[in-house]
C-alpha cells in the first residue's frame, strides 16, 4: 500500500487517523507542523499528503504552496483537512494547490474514497 504523509499538529487527531489508515494497510508518516511536512515531503516524497490547514510554524496553506512549487513534489496529491469549514476555504485550498478538501471530524469512508481516487489518477 502507498505511503501517506499526515501533517497534523493535534496529537489525538494525528494518532487516531494514523491508526485507522494503518489498519487499512497504508504506511503513515507524520509531521507536526507545516515546515516539518515540507521537509519530509522533499526528503522522501509520499504517494499522498493529508494536510491540516491550521498548523504551527508554517500553516498548511503555505506548506501546500511550497510542496506544489517544487518540481520534485508538485505531482503529489494533497487533501486539505480543516476543522473550520468557512465559506471560501475549499476555493482557498484549491488555489493553494490542494487536490481535494475534507472537513473534520474526519469520516473515514469519505476520506478513503477521496484518497483512492487521487492515488489512481
Predicted regions: what they are:
Residues 8:
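Conserved acidic carboxylate
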Residues 25-32, 40:
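Short hydrophobic/Thr-rich beta-strand motif most characteristic of the beta2 strand and flanking loop
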Amino acid at each position: 500500500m502507498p505511503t501517506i504523509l499526515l501533517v497534523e499538529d493535534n496529537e489525538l487527531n494525528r494518532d487516531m487517523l494514523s491508526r485507522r489508515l494503518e489498519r487499512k494497510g497504508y504506511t503513515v508518516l507524520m509531521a507536526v507542523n507545516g515546515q516539518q511536512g515540507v521537509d519530509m515531503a522533499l526528503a522522501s516524497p509520499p504517494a499522498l499528503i493529508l494536510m491540516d490547514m491550521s498548523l504551527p510554524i508554517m500553516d498548511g496553506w503555505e506548506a501546500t504552496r511550497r510542496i506544489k512549487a517544487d518540481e520534485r513534489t508538485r505531482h503529489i496529491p494533497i487533501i486539505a483537512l480543516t476543522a473550520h469549514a468557512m465559506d471560501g476555504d475549499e476555493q482557498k485550498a484549491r488555489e493553494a494547490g490542494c487536490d481535494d478538501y475534507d472537513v473534520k471530524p474526519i469520516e473515514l469512508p469519505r476520506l478513503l474514497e477521496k484518497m483512492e481516487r487521487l492515488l489512481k489518477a
